[in-house]
A protein has these predicted regions:
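"A position-specific structural signal for the A-helix of alpha-solenoid helical repeats
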Residues: 5, 22-25, 38-42, 73, ...
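Generic helix N-cap/helix-start motif at coil->alpha-helix transitions
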Residues: 1-3, 140-149, 177-186, 198-199, ...
């Protein structure tokens, strides 16, 4: 038995009896501490009293409240069981349990120690100069040892109650304790609550966030309560104050803005490996090539200038400097956008003994930290540590790494480099005081420290990792916290819109799908257009259309109309699509993409509404400005893939409508003679009309261009096949399959770098059968039977052995 077998009856069924029976079995199977058994006995006795009262025929008007209170007590006892499971399974929790036995974690006792430390530090000013340094170092070391034990004690602390949560909140907000102590304890409670979801500890973090006036404490508390939110939306029903607290916080616009910034920064952290690869491949080689320092066995020395270089190429130095500045600006731009540019370098510097202690990963940077004693000695007379603390552009974790690393190589540095340590230039671009007080910067810095812990700590698998986008293992979380149902409410919809745009821009379609599932009942037109991208990506056009249609007519935006028109084209509702594009052109008469789409719809309407699947060739919505709004991969009309079949009898076209479409199409070709999308549509229309030679001519010109796409080869193959040049069609189909496989490999590599699951690879057979099925109307119209399609697949695959 386990905690989850105790929790399930409570969360899913609200059944005390089943939960108590599960706990009884757990106690019988496992050797649990006496305090858990005692807690179980107390709850069991309370429940028996309720049963006895009912047996005697007594009625209690507050029976539901009493029953709910007993459920909460059982849940608390279950959390204690979960802690014991972690103590037995994970070394970090086992060590914390041993360490916790030496510390009293009651808030009153903690307050006494923390306030005494502040007072003792203040009294150091009155100590004689000769003894002050030694006494301060001892006081700091003793206090650090206490904080380490307290951190561990909070990690394995049993479930709190409302009184203890309130007392700890008051303590952490008190001006009479050191701020660094408060910051470290917030992290301890966060780590504990993430792994053992105590609603009272969570509420304490939320209370600190709401009441804190210190920006650093406030943002650390924000990260704390967000990352320790319960995944199961049913859980907070046992503790209504959780939902009430969330509702109250989400009513504040500042909180919403800070949550959105935090969510985006978490996704940037998740992309740290890809950013590091970009820096190592395209930026660092240039910066290293142009440095005048080199490492030798004797230390760092300056390289001598090459006298022949100025003679042979007098402009080389200037070009090198310009190139180095350009690469450096690119790296700084990445940082400004949110990229974690320092992770790659500092990830190699987390092997110092300092990082063996769990609490040190969460410690705010302090030059007086006991672990920096050797660094302070070696850097005596240098302002480096103070500059690092006050102006360093790194997160706290990296500041410790930098200080420890510099201290190690100090003796091997040339004198001029040692002198540089006294200037801010050593740290690269420093951070202004104003920027350091920006909540977004504070949050980003803290998240980067956390990311390093969850990626690099030696026992990282002991803890739930909130920086995972896919839940791959038991101890993985979900970095996309805004997809939690607990946060899905009208107040969050504007945040959801902004986040969906962010995800779409980075082609994170799986994460976009998670948001769609969370907000599937929304009628916000700006949000609906993003939610519809998920079924559109899977080719579920009717489902996407229904989402757009759910928006009240008077609330449609340009984006929702554009998406609805795309669905209509794919569903072969060309008449409806024509009406929508006319409406869009009334907004933007000169829009190229709207005119091109209208032309396609006009030439596809009425007599052609009974033809095959419509998708990308006819949809020019991906051309020009519309690409930013549609975005689903299957909606990429720029490829003009042959899945869009305008089939039907040519002579059945309504003359006036087709004439309008033809004129518009030739007008666009005249105005945009080099536009590939116009040429694709023209080629497709030529093929539909049986003008295969003209279609082939256009497709060959398209294939000769560097912006040709894989679907151009598929369409060109169709044109050759329909003109009975089968050999050329086979060659083009093989090229098409090769390109598709190359594109899939690149997409997989990109997904791997971002830590996301990859879509399954399509076999060549599957791909060709899928394409031929989509375009069956076109192929059948010109006499390509199902049998011929099967044979063509075998020819392309070269399957001669049977």
């Amino acid at each position: 038995m386990s905690f989850y077998e105790i929790e399930t009856p409570l969360i899913a069924k609200h059944n005390v009896g089943k939960a108590l029976r599960a706990m009884k079995e757990t106690i019988a199977e496992d050797k649990l501490p006496g305090y858990i058994v005692a807690r179980y006995e107390d709850v069991k006795n309370d429940y028996r009293l309720m049963q006895d009262a009912m047996m005697r025929g007594l009625r209690d008007d507050k029976i539901d409240e009493v029953y709910a209170d007993i459920m909460r007590k059982v849940y608390g006892a279950g959390l204690d069981v979960l802690i014991e499971e972690k103590v037995k399974k994970y070394s970090s929790f086992a060590y914390a349990r041993v360490s916790a036995q030496q510390t009293e974690a009651h808030p009153d006792a903690v307050r006494t120690v923390l306030e005494a430390y502040v007072q003792d530090m203040a009294m150091m000013a009155f100590e004689p100069e000769s003894t002050r340094k030694a006494k301060m170092e001892k006081l700091t070391a003793d206090h650090h040892a206490y904080m380490k034990q307290l951190f561990n004690a909070l990690l394995v602390a049993p479930m709190w109650n409302d009184r203890r949560a309130a007392d700890f909140a008051d303590l952490l907000l008190s001006p009479t304790i050191d701020r660094d102590d408060a910051l470290l304890l917030v992290s301890a409670v966060m780590l504990a609550t993430m792994n053992v979801n105590d609603p009272y500890k969570w509420d304490m973090l939320a209370e600190v966030y709401v009441r804190a006036t210190d920006k650093v404490l406030k943002m650390r508390a924000l990260v704390g309560w967000v990352l320790s939110l319960p995944y199961n939306p049913r859980g907070p029903r046992l503790f209504p104050f959780v939902q009430e607290r969330i509702k109250a916080m989400l009513a504040d616009k500042t909180t919403l803005k800070q949550m959105l910034d935090m969510q985006m920064q978490m996704l940037f952290c998740c992309n740290a490996d890809a950013d590091n690869e970009e820096i190592q491949r395209n930026i660092m080689p240039t910066l290293i090539k142009n440095t005048n320092l080199q490492m030798t066995r004797l230390g760092i020395v300056e390289k001598e200038d090459d006298p022949m270089k100025d003679i042979m190429d007098p402009n080389a130095a200037e070009r090198d400097m310009e190139e180095m500045e350009r690469k450096y600006r690119k790296m700084m731009d990445m940082q400004k956008q949110g990229s974690d540019i320092y992770f790659g370098g500092f990830s190699k510097m987390k092997t110092f003994p300092f990082f063996n202690d769990l609490c040190n990963w969460f410690a705010p940077f302090n030059a007086a930290h006991p672990a920096l004693g050797a660094a302070r000695e070696r850097l005596a007379g240098s302002t480096f540590l103070n500059n690092l603390m006050e102006n360093g552009p790194f997160c706290d974790s990296d500041k410790y790494s930098f200080a420890l690393a510099i201290a190690q190589i100090m003796d091997r540095m040339p004198d001029n480099v040692k002198e540089m340590l006294n200037s801010d230039a050593t740290l690269g671009p420093t951070v202004s005081k104003e920027e350091q007080e920006n909540p977004a910067y504070i949050c980003r810095s803290y998240l980067q420290s956390l990311y390093r812990f969850f990626r690099l700590y030696r026992s990282k698998r002991d803890f739930l990792n909130p920086f995972i986008l896919d839940e791959l293992e038991d101890n993985d979380g979900n970095a996309l916290f805004m997809s939690y149902k607990l946060l899905a409410c009208p107040e969050m919809e504007e945040n959801a819109v902004a986040l969906c745009g962010f995800l779409l821009k980075r082609k994170m379609m799986r994460e976009l799908m998670s948001m769609a599932i969370c907000y599937k009942s929304s009628q916000n037109p700006r949000l609906v257009r993003f939610l519809a991208l998920v079924p559109m990506t899977d080719g579920k056009w009717q489902e996407a259309y229904d989402l757009f249609a759910s928006v009240p007519e008077d609330q449609h935006t340009e984006e929702s109309l554009r998406g609805m028109a795309h669905c209509c084209m794919s569903l072969k509702r060309f008449g409806e699509a024509v009406a929508i594009y006319r409406r869009l052109l009334a907004m933007h008469p000169d829009s190229f993409s709207y005119q091109l789409n209208l032309a396609v719809c006009l030439m596809s309407s009425d007599a052609f509404s009974s033809c095959g699947d419509a998708s990308s060739c006819g949809d020019a919505s991906s051309c020009g400005d519309a690409s930013s709004s549609c975005g689903a991969s299957s909606c990429d009309a720029s490829s003009c893939d042959a899945a869009f079949s305008l089939g039907g009898k040519v002579e059945a076209r309504p003359n006036k409508v087709v004439e309008e479409g033809t004129k518009l199409l030739y007008k666009l070709d005249y105005e945009h003679p080099n536009n590939a999308n116009v040429r694709r549509v023209l080629a497709w229309c030529m093929m539909l009309q049986g003008n295969f030679d003209k279609a082939i001519d256009i497709y060959m010109r398209l294939l000769s261009q560097p912006d040709a796409v894989s679907a151009d080869r598929l369409n060109a193959a169709y044109a050759h096949w329909l003109s009975r040049d089968v050999a050329r069609a086979v060659a083009l189909l093989r090229e098409y399959c090769n390109l598709c496989e190359q594109e899939e490999a690149e997409a997989k590599e990109a997904a791997k770098k971002q830590g996301r699951r990859c879509e399954p690879t399509k076999s060549r057979n599957y791909r060709l059968v899928e394409d031929f099925t989509k375009d069956a109307d076109l192929l059948s119209k010109y006499g390509i039977s199902l049998t011929e399609r099967k044979i063509m697949v075998d020819i392309v695959l070269n399957e001669e052995e049977f």
